[in-house]
Protein backbone atom coordinates (compact mmCIF):
# COMPACT_ATOMS: atom_id res chain seq x y z
CA UNK A 1 0.00 0.00 0.00
CA UNK A 2 1.25 3.48 -0.91
CA UNK A 3 0.53 6.56 1.19
CA UNK A 4 1.31 10.27 0.88
CA UNK A 5 1.30 12.16 4.17
CA UNK A 6 1.08 15.97 4.12
CA UNK A 7 3.01 17.49 7.03
CA UNK A 8 6.47 16.21 7.96
CA UNK A 9 6.50 18.10 11.25
CA UNK A 10 6.63 16.51 14.69
CA UNK A 11 3.03 15.25 14.65
CA UNK A 12 3.37 13.90 11.11
CA UNK A 13 6.59 12.04 11.90
CA UNK A 14 5.86 11.11 15.51
CA UNK A 15 2.26 9.96 15.17
CA UNK A 16 0.52 9.30 11.84
CA UNK A 17 3.67 8.75 9.79
CA UNK A 18 4.99 6.32 12.39
CA UNK A 19 1.75 4.29 12.43
CA UNK A 20 1.76 4.07 8.63
CA UNK A 21 5.43 3.08 8.47
CA UNK A 22 4.94 0.50 11.25
CA UNK A 23 2.16 -1.02 9.10
CA UNK A 24 4.70 -1.46 6.24
CA UNK A 25 3.01 1.19 4.14
CA UNK A 26 5.23 2.69 1.41
CA UNK A 27 5.30 6.19 2.90
CA UNK A 28 6.20 9.55 1.38
CA UNK A 29 5.98 12.80 3.33
CA UNK A 30 4.97 16.07 1.65
CA UNK A 31 6.06 19.37 3.19
CA UNK A 32 7.38 22.84 2.31
CA UNK A 33 10.33 22.78 4.73
CA UNK A 34 13.28 22.07 2.43
CA UNK A 35 15.89 21.16 5.12
CA UNK A 36 13.38 18.63 6.50
CA UNK A 37 12.74 17.17 3.03
CA UNK A 38 16.48 16.97 2.32
CA UNK A 39 17.13 15.18 5.63
CA UNK A 40 14.33 12.65 5.04
CA UNK A 41 15.49 11.92 1.49
CA UNK A 42 19.12 11.60 2.47
CA UNK A 43 18.58 9.34 5.50
CA UNK A 44 15.30 7.58 4.56
CA UNK A 45 14.70 7.09 8.30
CA UNK A 46 14.35 8.89 11.63
CA UNK A 47 13.98 8.05 15.32
CA UNK A 48 10.97 8.52 17.59
CA UNK A 49 11.52 8.81 21.34
CA UNK A 50 8.47 7.51 23.20
CA UNK A 51 8.34 8.77 26.79
CA UNK A 52 6.26 7.47 29.69
CA UNK A 53 7.01 5.17 32.61
CA UNK A 54 9.70 3.67 30.37
CA UNK A 55 11.44 5.60 27.62
CA UNK A 56 12.20 3.83 24.35
CA UNK A 57 13.52 4.92 20.98
CA UNK A 58 12.05 3.37 17.82
CA UNK A 59 13.30 3.75 14.26
CA UNK A 60 11.02 4.62 11.35
CA UNK A 61 12.57 3.42 8.09
CA UNK A 62 12.05 3.38 4.32
CA UNK A 63 10.48 6.83 4.05
CA UNK A 64 10.94 9.55 1.44
CA UNK A 65 9.74 13.13 0.95
CA UNK A 66 8.52 15.56 -1.73
CA UNK A 67 7.59 19.24 -1.78
CA UNK A 68 3.86 19.74 -1.11
CA UNK A 69 3.31 21.82 -4.22
CA UNK A 70 5.43 19.75 -6.60
CA UNK A 71 4.57 17.63 -9.62
CA UNK A 72 5.95 14.69 -7.62
CA UNK A 73 3.24 15.21 -4.99
CA UNK A 74 0.56 15.40 -7.70
CA UNK A 75 1.86 12.17 -9.28
CA UNK A 76 1.85 10.41 -5.90
CA UNK A 77 -1.79 11.36 -5.28
CA UNK A 78 -2.63 9.90 -8.68
CA UNK A 79 -1.02 6.58 -7.68
CA UNK A 80 -1.52 6.31 -3.89
CA UNK A 81 -4.00 4.23 -1.90
CA UNK A 82 -4.10 6.63 1.05
CA UNK A 83 -3.51 10.36 1.60
CA UNK A 84 -3.25 11.66 5.17
CA UNK A 85 -2.55 15.10 6.64
CA UNK A 86 -1.19 16.61 9.85
CA UNK A 87 -0.61 20.20 8.74
CA UNK A 88 -2.80 22.24 11.10
CA UNK A 89 -6.38 23.37 10.46
CA UNK A 90 -5.40 26.61 8.74
CA UNK A 91 -3.15 24.88 6.18
CA UNK A 92 -5.76 22.43 4.84
CA UNK A 93 -7.00 24.99 2.33
CA UNK A 94 -3.43 25.54 1.10
CA UNK A 95 -2.86 21.86 0.23
CA UNK A 96 -6.29 21.46 -1.41
CA UNK A 97 -4.92 22.66 -4.77
CA UNK A 98 -2.27 19.95 -4.93
CA UNK A 99 -4.82 17.31 -3.93
CA UNK A 100 -7.30 18.53 -6.57
CA UNK A 101 -4.60 18.39 -9.27
CA UNK A 102 -3.62 14.90 -8.13
CA UNK A 103 -7.23 13.72 -8.37
CA UNK A 104 -7.55 15.15 -11.89
CA UNK A 105 -4.40 13.27 -12.92
CA UNK A 106 -5.70 10.09 -11.24
CA UNK A 107 -8.92 10.32 -13.28
CA UNK A 108 -7.04 11.07 -16.51
CA UNK A 109 -4.68 8.13 -15.83
CA UNK A 110 -7.70 5.83 -15.51
CA UNK A 111 -6.77 4.77 -11.96
CA UNK A 112 -10.07 3.49 -10.54
CA UNK A 113 -8.61 1.90 -7.37
CA UNK A 114 -10.24 3.38 -4.26
CA UNK A 115 -8.35 6.30 -2.71
CA UNK A 116 -9.06 7.43 0.83
CA UNK A 117 -8.08 10.81 2.23
CA UNK A 118 -7.91 11.31 6.02
CA UNK A 119 -7.16 14.69 7.62
CA UNK A 120 -5.65 14.01 11.06
CA UNK A 121 -6.10 17.47 12.53
CA UNK A 122 -7.03 19.02 15.85
CA UNK A 123 -10.50 19.99 14.62
CA UNK A 124 -14.03 18.67 14.20
CA UNK A 125 -14.60 16.82 10.88
CA UNK A 126 -11.45 18.25 9.31
CA UNK A 127 -11.61 15.90 6.30
CA UNK A 128 -15.11 17.12 5.45
CA UNK A 129 -13.75 20.68 5.43
CA UNK A 130 -10.79 19.61 3.29
CA UNK A 131 -13.24 17.92 0.88
CA UNK A 132 -15.10 21.22 0.40
CA UNK A 133 -11.81 23.04 -0.34
CA UNK A 134 -10.84 20.33 -2.87
CA UNK A 135 -14.22 20.20 -4.62
CA UNK A 136 -14.19 23.99 -4.99
CA UNK A 137 -10.95 23.70 -6.98
CA UNK A 138 -11.89 20.57 -8.94
CA UNK A 139 -13.11 21.08 -12.55
CA UNK A 140 -16.74 20.01 -12.93
CA UNK A 141 -15.84 17.25 -15.39
CA UNK A 142 -14.05 15.38 -12.59
CA UNK A 143 -16.47 15.95 -9.69
CA UNK A 144 -18.72 12.93 -10.19
CA UNK A 145 -15.74 10.60 -10.70
CA UNK A 146 -14.09 11.82 -7.49
CA UNK A 147 -17.28 11.31 -5.46
CA UNK A 148 -17.43 7.73 -6.78
CA UNK A 149 -13.75 6.76 -6.39
CA UNK A 150 -12.42 8.82 -3.46
CA UNK A 151 -13.36 8.53 0.21
CA UNK A 152 -12.98 11.58 2.44
CA UNK A 153 -12.78 10.04 5.90
CA UNK A 154 -13.14 12.11 9.07
CA UNK A 155 -11.04 11.20 12.09
CA UNK A 156 -10.27 12.05 15.70
CA UNK A 157 -6.61 12.08 16.72
CA UNK A 158 -4.97 12.35 20.12
CA UNK A 159 -1.29 12.32 20.98
CA UNK A 160 0.76 14.99 22.72
CA UNK A 161 3.79 15.79 20.56
CA UNK A 162 5.71 18.83 21.88
CA UNK A 163 8.17 20.76 19.69
CA UNK A 164 11.74 19.45 19.55
CA UNK A 165 13.81 20.67 22.45
CA UNK A 166 16.17 23.54 21.81
CA UNK A 167 19.69 22.31 21.39
CA UNK A 168 18.76 19.12 19.56
CA UNK A 169 20.98 18.96 16.48
CA UNK A 170 18.90 16.27 14.76
CA UNK A 171 16.22 17.95 12.63
CA UNK A 172 14.31 14.64 12.36
CA UNK A 173 14.34 13.51 16.01
CA UNK A 174 10.91 13.65 17.64
CA UNK A 175 9.59 12.95 21.14
CA UNK A 176 6.03 11.71 21.78
CA UNK A 177 4.02 10.44 24.74
CA UNK A 178 3.13 6.74 25.00
CA UNK A 179 -0.61 7.35 24.59
CA UNK A 180 -2.08 7.68 21.11
CA UNK A 181 -5.57 7.44 19.63
CA UNK A 182 -6.59 7.59 15.94
CA UNK A 183 -10.29 6.93 15.38
CA UNK A 184 -11.79 7.08 11.88
CA UNK A 185 -15.34 7.10 10.52
CA UNK A 186 -15.70 3.69 8.90
CA UNK A 187 -18.88 4.77 7.06
CA UNK A 188 -16.93 7.21 4.84
CA UNK A 189 -14.35 4.88 3.25
CA UNK A 190 -14.33 4.17 -0.44
CA UNK A 191 -13.85 0.39 -0.65
CA UNK A 192 -12.54 -1.60 2.31
CA UNK A 193 -10.80 0.34 5.12
CA UNK A 194 -7.04 -0.41 5.21
CA UNK A 195 -5.78 -2.60 8.06
CA UNK A 196 -3.47 -0.26 9.99
CA UNK A 197 -2.69 -1.21 13.61
CA UNK A 198 -3.49 1.81 15.79
CA UNK A 199 -6.25 3.09 13.47
CA UNK A 200 -9.60 2.34 15.12
CA UNK A 201 -12.86 2.22 13.14
CA UNK A 202 -16.17 3.57 14.42
CA UNK A 203 -19.63 4.36 13.08
CA UNK A 204 -20.16 6.97 15.83
CA UNK A 205 -17.24 9.33 15.26
CA UNK A 206 -18.80 12.49 16.70
CA UNK A 207 -18.98 10.90 20.16
CA UNK A 208 -15.20 10.36 20.07
CA UNK A 209 -14.47 13.73 18.41
CA UNK A 210 -16.37 15.56 21.14
CA UNK A 211 -14.97 13.34 23.91
CA UNK A 212 -11.46 14.36 22.87
CA UNK A 213 -12.35 18.01 22.17
CA UNK A 214 -14.27 18.46 25.44
CA UNK A 215 -11.69 16.66 27.60
CA UNK A 216 -8.11 16.63 26.27
CA UNK A 217 -8.40 19.89 24.28
CA UNK A 218 -10.53 21.74 26.84
CA UNK A 219 -8.28 20.66 29.70
CA UNK A 220 -5.04 21.35 27.80
CA UNK A 221 -6.14 24.87 26.82
CA UNK A 222 -7.38 25.84 30.29
CA UNK A 223 -4.17 24.46 31.84
CA UNK A 224 -2.18 26.66 29.46
CA UNK A 225 -4.23 29.82 30.04
CA UNK A 226 -4.35 29.50 33.83
CA UNK A 227 -0.71 28.40 33.78
CA UNK A 228 0.30 31.59 32.00
CA UNK A 229 -1.76 33.64 34.48
CA UNK A 230 0.11 31.93 37.35
CA UNK A 231 3.45 32.41 35.54
CA UNK A 232 4.15 28.71 35.04
CA UNK A 233 6.30 27.77 32.06
CA UNK A 234 5.15 24.24 31.21
CA UNK A 235 1.90 22.29 31.23
CA UNK A 236 3.39 19.98 33.89
CA UNK A 237 4.26 22.94 36.15
CA UNK A 238 0.75 24.33 35.71
CA UNK A 239 -1.20 21.11 36.35
CA UNK A 240 0.84 20.44 39.51
CA UNK A 241 -0.42 23.79 40.87
CA UNK A 242 -3.43 22.78 43.05
CA UNK A 243 -5.43 25.92 42.14
CA UNK A 244 -4.96 25.36 38.40
CA UNK A 245 -5.63 21.64 38.69
CA UNK A 246 -8.92 22.16 40.55
CA UNK A 247 -10.31 24.40 37.80
CA UNK A 248 -9.02 22.19 34.96
CA UNK A 249 -10.47 19.03 36.49
CA UNK A 250 -13.71 20.86 37.28
CA UNK A 251 -14.01 22.11 33.69
CA UNK A 252 -13.41 18.61 32.29
CA UNK A 253 -16.07 17.26 34.65
CA UNK A 254 -18.52 19.96 33.49
CA UNK A 255 -17.88 19.20 29.81
CA UNK A 256 -17.97 15.48 30.69
CA UNK A 257 -21.49 15.85 32.07
CA UNK A 258 -22.51 17.13 28.62
CA UNK A 259 -20.92 14.08 26.93
CA UNK A 260 -22.61 11.67 29.34
CA UNK A 261 -25.98 13.30 28.63
CA UNK A 262 -25.46 13.55 24.86
CA UNK A 263 -23.81 10.22 24.04
CA UNK A 264 -24.55 8.00 27.03
CA UNK A 265 -20.90 7.59 28.07
CA UNK A 266 -20.44 5.60 31.27
CA UNK A 267 -19.82 8.09 34.12
CA UNK A 268 -17.18 5.96 35.90
CA UNK A 269 -15.28 5.26 32.67
CA UNK A 270 -15.36 8.93 31.76
CA UNK A 271 -14.03 9.89 35.21
CA UNK A 272 -11.14 7.44 34.59
CA UNK A 273 -10.57 9.05 31.15
CA UNK A 274 -10.31 12.49 32.82
CA UNK A 275 -7.80 11.16 35.36
CA UNK A 276 -5.76 9.57 32.55
CA UNK A 277 -5.58 12.94 30.80
CA UNK A 278 -4.49 14.70 33.99
CA UNK A 279 -1.68 12.14 34.33
CA UNK A 280 -0.66 12.80 30.70
CA UNK A 281 -0.39 16.52 31.48
CA UNK A 282 1.93 15.62 34.39
CA UNK A 283 4.34 13.61 32.20
CA UNK A 284 7.80 14.78 33.38
CA UNK A 285 9.38 13.82 30.04
CA UNK A 286 7.21 16.20 27.97
CA UNK A 287 8.41 19.79 28.19
CA UNK A 288 5.27 21.36 26.73
CA UNK A 289 5.27 25.15 26.96
CA UNK A 290 2.06 26.89 28.10
CA UNK A 291 2.59 29.61 25.49
CA UNK A 292 2.63 26.99 22.71
CA UNK A 293 -0.48 25.16 23.93
CA UNK A 294 -2.39 28.42 24.37
CA UNK A 295 -1.69 29.88 20.93
CA UNK A 296 -4.46 30.78 18.47
CA UNK A 297 -6.90 31.96 21.18
CA UNK A 298 -9.38 33.35 18.63
CA UNK A 299 -9.86 29.88 17.15
CA UNK A 300 -10.00 28.28 20.58
CA UNK A 301 -12.69 30.78 21.69
CA UNK A 302 -14.84 30.24 18.57
CA UNK A 303 -18.29 28.65 18.79
CA UNK A 304 -17.30 25.17 17.60
CA UNK A 305 -14.09 24.79 19.58
CA UNK A 306 -12.86 23.52 22.95
CA UNK A 307 -14.12 26.26 25.29
CA UNK A 308 -17.41 27.58 23.91
CA UNK A 309 -18.80 24.33 22.48
CA UNK A 310 -18.83 22.50 25.84
CA UNK A 311 -20.23 25.67 27.46
CA UNK A 312 -23.10 25.65 24.94
CA UNK A 313 -23.69 22.01 25.86
CA UNK A 314 -24.02 22.92 29.54
CA UNK A 315 -26.60 25.55 28.58
CA UNK A 316 -28.47 23.04 26.40
CA UNK A 317 -28.75 20.51 29.24
CA UNK A 318 -28.99 23.05 32.12
CA UNK A 319 -25.73 21.88 33.70
CA UNK A 320 -23.11 23.74 35.83
CA UNK A 321 -20.30 25.58 34.00
CA UNK A 322 -18.43 27.76 36.54
CA UNK A 323 -15.00 26.25 35.76
CA UNK A 324 -15.50 26.49 31.99
CA UNK A 325 -16.29 30.20 32.50
CA UNK A 326 -12.99 30.63 34.39
CA UNK A 327 -11.17 28.94 31.49
CA UNK A 328 -12.83 31.26 28.96
CA UNK A 329 -11.90 34.34 31.01
CA UNK A 330 -8.30 33.11 31.29
CA UNK A 331 -8.17 32.54 27.51
CA UNK A 332 -9.09 36.20 27.00
CA UNK A 333 -6.04 37.13 29.08
CA UNK A 334 -3.66 35.02 26.95
CA UNK A 335 -0.77 37.09 25.58
CA UNK A 336 2.08 36.16 23.24
CA UNK A 337 4.17 38.48 21.09
CA UNK A 338 4.84 35.54 18.75
CA UNK A 339 1.18 34.66 18.09
CA UNK A 340 -0.78 36.88 15.63
CA UNK A 341 -4.11 35.76 17.14
CA UNK A 342 -2.98 36.74 20.64
CA UNK A 343 -2.00 40.18 19.35
CA UNK A 344 -5.36 40.54 17.59
CA UNK A 345 -7.21 39.44 20.74
CA UNK A 346 -5.38 42.06 22.84
CA UNK A 347 -6.21 44.75 20.27
CA UNK A 348 -9.90 43.75 20.16
CA UNK A 349 -10.14 43.96 23.95
CA UNK A 350 -8.37 47.33 23.93
CA UNK A 351 -10.75 48.80 21.33
CA UNK A 352 -14.05 46.99 22.03
CA UNK A 353 -13.75 45.95 25.67
CA UNK A 354 -14.02 42.37 26.97
CA UNK A 355 -17.79 41.93 26.55
CA UNK A 356 -18.02 42.93 22.87
CA UNK A 357 -14.81 41.03 22.12
CA UNK A 358 -16.11 37.79 23.63
CA UNK A 359 -19.44 38.16 21.82
CA UNK A 360 -17.71 38.80 18.49
CA UNK A 361 -15.30 35.85 18.79
CA UNK A 362 -17.65 33.28 20.34
CA UNK A 363 -21.05 34.13 18.91
CA UNK A 364 -22.54 34.09 22.44
CA UNK A 365 -25.52 36.36 23.12
CA UNK A 366 -24.33 39.76 24.36
CA UNK A 367 -27.08 39.90 26.99
CA UNK A 368 -26.59 36.33 28.22
CA UNK A 369 -25.77 35.47 31.80
CA UNK A 370 -22.67 33.47 30.74
CA UNK A 371 -21.14 36.48 28.96
CA UNK A 372 -21.73 38.64 32.05
CA UNK A 373 -20.17 35.91 34.23
CA UNK A 374 -17.14 35.56 31.95
CA UNK A 375 -16.57 39.33 31.89
CA UNK A 376 -16.81 39.52 35.70
CA UNK A 377 -14.25 36.71 36.07
CA UNK A 378 -12.04 38.33 33.39
CA UNK A 379 -12.09 41.67 35.26
CA UNK A 380 -11.34 39.95 38.57
CA UNK A 381 -8.21 38.40 36.98
CA UNK A 382 -6.74 41.82 36.10
UniProtKB/Swiss-Prot annotation:
One of its GO terms (cellular component) is cytosol. GO terms for biological process: mannitol catabolic process. Belongs to the mannitol dehydrogenase family. This is Mannitol-1-phosphate 5-dehydrogenase. It catalyses: D-mannitol 1-phosphate + NAD(+) = beta-D-fructose 6-phosphate + NADH + H(+). Pfam families: Mannitol_dh, Mannitol_dh_C. Gene3D superfamilies: N-(1-d-carboxylethyl)-l-norvaline Dehydrogenase, domain 2, NAD(P)-binding Rossmann-like Domain. The lineage of its organism: Bacteria, Pseudomonadati, Pseudomonadota, Gammaproteobacteria, Enterobacterales. Signal peptide: none annotated. InterPro entries: 6-PGluconate_DH-like_C_sf, 6PGD_dom2, Mannitol_1_phos_5_DH, Mannitol_DH, Mannitol_DH_C, Mannitol_DH_CS, Mannitol_DH_N, NAD(P)-bd_dom_sf. NAD(+) binds at residues 3-14. Its EC number is 1.1.1.17. Keywords: NAD, Oxidoreductase. It is an enzyme of class 1 (oxidoreductase). GO terms for molecular function: mannitol-1-phosphate 5-dehydrogenase activity. It comes from Pectobacterium atrosepticum (strain SCRI 1043 / ATCC BAA-672) (Erwinia carotovora subsp. atroseptica).
Amino acid sequence: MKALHFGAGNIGRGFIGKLLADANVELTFADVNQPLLDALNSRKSYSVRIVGDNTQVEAVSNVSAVHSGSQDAIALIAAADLVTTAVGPQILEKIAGTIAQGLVKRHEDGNTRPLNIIACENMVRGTSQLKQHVLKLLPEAHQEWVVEHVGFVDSAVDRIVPPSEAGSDDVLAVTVETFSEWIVDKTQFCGEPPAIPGMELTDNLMAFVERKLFTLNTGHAITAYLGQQARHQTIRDAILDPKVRAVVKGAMEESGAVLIKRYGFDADKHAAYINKILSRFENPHLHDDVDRVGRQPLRKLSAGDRLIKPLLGTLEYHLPHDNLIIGIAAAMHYRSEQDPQALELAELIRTLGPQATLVQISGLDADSEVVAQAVNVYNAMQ
